[in-house]
Amino acid sequence: HLIHDAYNANPLSVAEALKTLVELSGSSRRIVVFGDMLELGDHSAAYHEEIGRQIGASKIYALFLKGDLARITASAAESAGLDRNHIFFFDGKGTAIPALREVVSKGDWILLKGSRKMHLDELIPDIRLFGG
């Protein structure tokens, strides 16, 4: 199952997308593919840290991150309970797809969320081929 919400991203829309993922997925595994939220100004790092905490608290199985603030998000997610071995970084389709293919299983719920300039939509055709 794939939730594609990677056209625009801000702290509120990410929080709502996570809430939707949790509600729809039930007891299935949850995977988040998250690209940076852009154009947030001076508070950008703090917003990414808060989103990381929310991700970590949402019982996510795996987190895939793209962007300059990915390490901040990852650190906060790990501090909030996400296993560091289930956090992955990618810089484009070439590195994301092989890693996702290793992790994603049939029945998993995948949320793609990030600003449009992160180009997460480029991952959709491949994700659909192997289970999303």
Give the predicted meaning of each segment:
Residues 1-132:
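ATP-dependent carboxylate-amine ligase
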